[in-house]
Amino acid sequence: METRRLGRLGHQSSVLIYGAASLGVVDQDRADASIQEALDAGINHFDVAADYGDAELRLGPRMGEIRDRIFLATKTGRRTYDEAWFEINRSLERLQTDRVDLIQMHAVCDLENLDLVTGKGGSLEAAIRAKEEGMVGAIGITGHTAEAPSVHREGLRRFDFDSVLTPLNYRLSTDPKYADDYAALVEAVKASDAALMTIKMIARRNWQEGEDHAYDTWYRPFDEQRYVTAATAWLLNGHPEITGLATAGETRLLQQMIVAERERADLSPEDAAAILDEVQDYASVFVDIPI
């Protein structure tokens, strides 16, 4: 699997980042199988969060075996220093490790939350202490709304975050405002040499009222290989600034994303976009976020 430099952190991360939200509601056997599937495919970057149900608890038992083989990132969604400090320590306990490579400020989706994170007594102060004490290697910021790129750009102005995790897919790119905000974020990231990672690549639309939720994701994902491959090719082949993309929060979709990464080589971003344009119900999942 292709690897890309994780900004100034220097790690050569696999372009597919294991999105451990997929482990939040599964048992240990299913988690172990999915983790092994990722490792066998060459995925060496794992991304989890304290808020992902039991995900940290599912990863923890594997750390003795794999910790020195992976880049390990987690997140805290707490907004005060005390709450975040407690949660960072709990994450280390649950992950059965004394250090993570990256702690991220989770779901910073608007300026109100950014103010809480970066203000006096905010969670960023806890992350800085954790870095000073060797508990974390770096500090990042994440979020998933239509406003995320502009909020994350402002976040970089306030603090020298080592990484940004923000949404990007073909449908979002067709919104002129989103495209402009994303382009401005890219320039800010390049200026600071931060890592730029993405989420929601295979998000197709929101679940409709009464629709069977066939997957654990809060949105309806692409699950046809043709479209998963097109979405992957559009993003990775057309966006060299992206260091990696998080796989969807559903273990049953991991193999399709692995196949897509392998098969994307001969598909140009333009041809990939043409394939995605075939999808009549392809829409932004941020119009009505159910979480």
Where would I find each of the regions flagged by the language model?
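Short acidic capping loops at alpha-helix termini that bridge into adjacent secondary structure
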Residues: 14-15, 67-70, 98-102, 137-138
